[in-house]
Structures are given as C-alpha cells and as structure tokens.
UniProtKB/Swiss-Prot annotation:
Keywords linked to the UniProt accession: Ribonucleoprotein, Ribosomal protein, RNA-binding, rRNA-binding
Family stated for the protein in its record: Belongs to the universal ribosomal protein uL6 family.
Record's subunit section: Part of the 50S ribosomal subunit.
GO BP field: cytoplasmic translation
Disulfide bonds: none
Organism, as annotated: Chlamydia pneumoniae (Chlamydophila pneumoniae)
Keyword rRNA-binding annotated: yes
Protein name: Large ribosomal subunit protein uL6
GO molecular function, a single term: structural constituent of ribosome
Keyword Cytoplasm found: no
HAMAP family: Ribosomal_uL6_B (MF_01365_B)
Gene: rplF
Length: 183
C-alpha cells in the first residue's frame, strides 16, 4: 500500500468534490476536472477530506491502484485550486518562439518554422522570445505538452543548445581533443 494513500486529501477553501457511480468530479476556482474511477478502490468524502481505500473484495492489485488514485485525485484538487505550470527555455542562436492563434510557432534552427497545435485547455505564453510558459489544470496534459515541445529540439551535450525545462541541468561533454589542444 502506498504510504501517502493512508493520509486523507484535504480540500482547500472553494474546492468541491462529487463522487458519482464511476466518476470523480472536482470543481474549483480555476475550473473542473473529471476522472473515471475503478472498482479496485473505494473513494469516500468525509468532513472536507477525501479518503482512498482499497476495495475489500479485490485481492488482485488493490494497493497499487490505491496509491495511483490518491495521486490522481490529489493532482486534480491542486489543479483546480492553484493550477500547474511548466516553463521551458530555448538556448541557441536564432531560437525563438511565438504564439499565433491556436499554434505555438518555434524557430529552432531548421529550414522551416515548427508549428505545434496548443490544446484548448492549456494557456501558452512566450516571454522574451525564448521563455515558454505552459499553464493548465491537468498536470498530465501540462507535462505531456511541455515534453512534446522539448522533444522538438532536446538540449545537446556539447554546446547545450536546444529546448530545456527551466532550471534543468544538462550534463555537458568535452569536445574533441584536437579542438581543445590536448594530445
């Protein structure tokens, strides 16, 4: 059993949770999220707290599902209350980004601009042409979209050029010995 799943999920002020047959709906000041539930876990709402327990009739995989659904519901509560944000930075000569309508337009050192469609539930903004901010309610969707941006030009280990997460450490490699003057 997950140790975190033993603790209740406390609901902040302004967040409402409703548990229907096979759905969990979390509403808050930033919006609402829905998650489908499974029969392996029992989710109960008591005194402004959510409890996630393994169902007593299931012996196959109860503990892993308990931890999974605890984390999913906890992320939903945090998402509708505060939201999630991933920031990326572009490092390289001529690298820049801009938001044009429903597309993120990237100039990343190829002959054509790269256009990435922005999901409707996310807000993407660009600061200083090289800092990209992805915001949204759903932690998984924010992370997936930020990872898809980073995958267009991951940072390379020699000069560090590419798209990286803010404060990400890129392990650098030494160049050829001939260039550094070593024998």
């Amino acid at each position: 059993m997950s140790r975190k799943a033993r603790e209740p999920i406390l609901l902040p002020q302004g967040v409402e949770v409703s548990i229907q047959d096979d759905k969990i709906i979390v509403k808050g000041p930033k919006g609402s999220l829905t998650q489908k539930s499974v029969k392996e876990v029992e989710i109960t709402l008591k005194d402004n707290s959510i409890f996630v327990h393994a169902a007593p009739h299931v012996v196959d995989r109860p503990s892993c599902m308990q931890g999974l659904y605890w984390a999913l519901i906890s992320n939903m509560v945090q998402g509708v209350h505060l939201g999630f944000e991933k920031r990326l930075e572009m490092i390289g000569v001529g690298f820049r980004a801009s938001v044009q309508g429903a597309f993120l337009d990237l100039s990343i050192g190829v002959s054509h601009p790269t256009k990435i469609p922005i999901p409707s539930t996310l807000q993407v903004s660009v600061e200083k042409n090289t800092l990209i901010s992805v915001k949204g309610l759903d932690k998984q969707l924010v992370g997936e979209f930020a990872a898809s941006i980073r995958a267009k030009r991951p940072p390379e280990p020699y000069k560090g050029k590419g798209i990286r997460y803010e404060n990400e450490y890129v392990r650098r490699k030494a160049g050829k010995a001939a260039k550094t003057g070593k024998k």
